[in-house]
Amino acid sequence: STGAGDDTISVTQGTLLAVTGVQSSIITGGTGADTITSVHINAASGLTASFNFAAGDSIVTGYDKITGYDLATASLFSDKLDFSGTAAVGTLATQNDFGTITSSNVATAGIATFDDAAGFATALIVNSTNLADVVGYLNANTAVEDTMAFLFDSTGNGVADSTMVYHNETGATDTIVLLSGQTGVNTLITANAHTAADAFIL
């Protein structure tokens, strides 16, 4: 755990054991735009890495970047993103405009794409230029504790290279976290399981 500021955190572990009821590592960056690198192999059950976020820790103007976030496989658990409150998988049941974002689509649980057309047709590339509008749109169309993920172009070259995870907080500022280099998230889940490409949120 660290305090305020833009911290760099590196954690290297081996293959984690199937021990229940505990976490192998709990990483809390605190406020600021933290850069977190984690190297490990999760267990089939029990031990995983947990990345913890309080409201205000990782926001649109300064968000955390995680390299080495492991998704679930057919035999291994996913790492955990532990937000304040109890995370739920969002659905985007409404489509209230915000900035340039006027429509959205959710093809699998918790995974969203966005368009600047009134009727969703083509998914926009989300990058630093339109990120604030996407976060505003998610805030306008999700409930408190709802969590969504979407592909993100972190370099501005027009190609999505990472995944951003959004959590609707009770206060005015919502949480977003970048899973750097991770583009294969299939669904968000609230109970860890052996399902390929799922990301565990809590």
How should these model regions be labeled?
Residues 1-108:
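Acidic, glycine-rich calcium-binding repeat modules characteristic of RTX/beta-roll
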Residues 77-79, 107-202:
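Low-complexity acidic/polar repeat-biased segments
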